[in-house]
UniProtKB/Swiss-Prot annotation:
Lineage: Bacteria, Pseudomonadati, Pseudomonadota, Betaproteobacteria, Burkholderiales
Protein name (database record): Urease accessory protein UreD
Underlying gene: ureD
GO molecular function: nickel cation binding
Cellular component terms (Gene Ontology): cytoplasm
Source species: Delftia acidovorans (strain DSM 14801 / SPH-1)
Family assignment from sequence similarity: Belongs to the UreD family.
Length: 305
């Protein structure tokens, strides 16, 4: 992808929902991992936290009651996981990004994982309707000794209904634009940076070295303080299990940490249908969760609904 805005520069939006959600998870003696702080403004909420795996892991579901992101909306989500706590966050369904009508929409997510804490950031996919102008930014910063697994997925258009994100009928939709900013860091030191921009007619949409004409892109990342010698066989095991066909293509890579920094394991997916991309993400999580988080891979019940 081509270079775009710096990670800190999520553009201000014109009139629309201005929403904020600030969550903090802590570890309490005799209680385990708990949601210790929740503050919001605008239409962002968190459901009552649950502990389906026992007190050690706090599950939380993030809600956006309007049901979609419209032109001019600006959403900000801040999550902090304190030492010793383990939080798993997901969403109840796809986030729909509607036609922007000349007003860009944006969502910025800032995740902070403190020493000895664990975060699983597992939202469902982002679906861009025809003419959506969307900016999505994710900034994860881990303290030494922290662990995190997360993913994101982008669907360009409602392909099941024959709708394309960058076309209305046979004509390109000039307003269609997607800006992505991802930053993973440890102690403020970058581990992985990705910035890019797509728009209607962009060559990357059809390029065999980019989107290859497929409407879905997904990424899974895992950061853990394991030595490189322990991460390499895990990366190879993951890569060997991944599909490569006309319907879904996936690959894995390992970014070695430098100077004592943790390594980052990346899984990238292109797919024609979200079901195929989702299956690859779930299988990656099932492999990595026991190995890196020392927890059985028990999918949240919400994923089955």
């Amino acid at each position: 992808m081509s270079a775009a805005l710096p990670i800190t520069a999520v553009p201000a939006c014109a009139s629309g929902w201005q929403a904020m959600l600030d969550l903090r998870f802590g570890h309490r003696a005799g209680q385990g991992s708990v949601l210790s702080h929740a503050r919001h403004s605008g239409p962002l909420r968190v459901q009552k936290p649950l502990h389906p795996e026992g007190p050690g892991i706090c599950h939380a579901v993030l809600l956006h009651p309007p049901g979609g992101v419209a032109g001019g909306d600006q959403l900000q989500i801040d999550v902090t996981v304190e030492p010793g706590a383990h939080a798993l966050l997901t969403t109840p369904g796809a986030t729909r990004w509607y036609k922007s009508q000349g007003r860009p929409a944006a969502q910025r997510v800032r995740l902070r994982v403190e020493e000895g804490a664990i975060l699983e950031w597992l939202p469902q996919e982002n679906m861009l309707f025809a003419g959506a102008d969307a900016t999505m930014a994710l900034d994860l910063d881990l303290a030494p000794g922290a662990r995190a697994i997360g993913w994101d997925a982008v669907v360009l258009g409602r392909y099941g209904a024959g709708e394309h994100w960058n076309h209305t009928g046979a004509a390109p939709t000039a307003a269609a634009r997607l800006q992505l900013h991802n930053r993973l860091a440890c102690g403020g030191r970058p581990l992985w940076l990705e910035q890019g921009e797509l728009h209607a007619g962009h060559a990357l949409l059809s390029s065999p070295v980019a989107w290859a004409g497929l409407p879905i892109q997904a990424s899974l990342w895992a950061v853990a303080p394991e030595p490189l010698a322990a991460m390499e066989p895990l990366s190879e095991q993951l890569a060997a299990s991944l599909p490569w066909s006309d319907e879904v293509r996936a690959g894995a890579s390992l970014l070695a940490g430098q100077g004592g920094a943790p390594s980052v394991l990346l899984l990238r997916v292109l797919a024609r249908r979200m079901e195929a991309a989702r299956a690859v993400l779930h299988e990656g999580w099932r492999l990595l969760r026991p190995a890196l988080l020392n927890q059985q891979a028990r999918p949240p019940r919400l994923w089955a609904t």
